[in-house]
Amino acid sequence: MADAPRTVLISGCSSGIGLELAVQLAHDPRQRYQVVATMRDLGKKGTLETAAGEALGQTLTVAQLDVCSDESVAQCLNCIQGGEVDVLVNNAGVGLVGPLEGLSLAAMQNVFDTNFFGAVRLVKAVLPSMKRRRQGHIVVVSSVMGLQGVVFNEVYAASKFAMEGFFESLAVQLLQFNIFISLVEPGPVVTEFEGKLLEQVSTAEFPGTDPDTLSYFRDLYLPASRELFHNVGQSPQDVAKVIVKVIGSARPPLRRRTNTRYTPLIALKAMDPSGSLYVRTSHCLLFRWPRLLNLGLRCLACSCFRTPVWPR
């Protein structure tokens, strides 16, 4: 007798990784999953429903969920049969990039409200049921910026560092209840949203920022960032494939990076526990040797660094 499908609740499915993951799980050939694909604004569900095709209403349902609202989370769980979630995928997130002096505290708080407290809110909601049943899997879409700081991404990186520390700590306790936590750590992901964001910040004023810092951001960081996305970036489909493997694993890993081409960029931090090697090298590459940085990024795009296909 086949096992009953596992209920998978995914946040942030209007586009990008969340959308691709929901569709891939819903089209699982063995029909192992019943996907609840959520988003804050149901007015944006059209792309997901089109991509889901015949799976819509069968192995995939769309629901409203604002991870920043206790009421919205409760309403969403009430719509799930039995209110029981077998796999929770914390994917909803927002970005923030730019010179620190030009960013408002309200914008910073919004990043933490969504990226960190939104994930915590969902976990608190599903954990009692998972503990009672002594089974469950919590997947967190983190980032390599949860492993290393990146210039002009201080607030976003801080939110991901918070997620990494929180869920690593929680993982120890939850093993006692046969509940697994997996932190999935993508590098740059090429989406329409990212392209628009880079264009918007390239002309933003960032009031309160000194001319030198603004010049560094526009003339050094933004070109390097575009080069990074072009040479090292993954598609949402590729990241989703890795997450599907993680969800289907008999013993899910605590951490899984999705892009081996990014590995050399985080190796410097591992090589020097003091952190000085990473900070000084990053500083020199961005501010003194930008041409060398661009050359290095192009080298990372060669086939020897391509992301492998993880075995089933």
Curated annotation (Swiss-Prot):
Question: Which of the seven top EC classes does this enzyme belong to?
Answer: oxidoreductase
Any one Gene Ontology BP term? retinol metabolic process
Spell out the InterPro entries in the cross-references: 17beta_DH (IPR011348), NAD(P)-bd_dom_sf (IPR036291), Sc_DH/Rdtase_CS (IPR020904), SDR_fam (IPR002347)
Q: Where is the active site?
A: Y156
The record lists NADP(+) as bound by: L9, I10, S11, G12, C13, S14, S15, G16, I17, G18
Q: Which Pfam families match?
A: adh_short (PF00106)
Q: Which sequence ranges are marked TM in the entry?
A: 87-107, 138-158, 170-190
Q: Name one GO molecular function term.
A: estradiol 17-beta-dehydrogenase [NAD(P)+] activity
What chemistry does it catalyse, as a reaction equation?
all-trans-retinol + NADP(+) = all-trans-retinal + NADPH + H(+)
Check the UniProt entry and state the signal peptide residues, or none: none
Tell me what topology the record assigns in the membrane. Multi-pass membrane protein
Record's PROSITE patterns?
Answer: ADH_SHORT (PS00061)
PANTHER family linked:
RETINOL DEHYDROGENASE 8, RETINOL DEHYDROGENASE-RELATED
Give the function comment from the record.
Retinol dehydrogenase with a clear preference for NADP. Converts all-trans-retinal to all-trans-retinol. May play a role in the regeneration of visual pigment at high light intensity.
Name-wise, this protein is: Retinol dehydrogenase 8
Tell me the name of the encoding gene.
Answer: RDH8
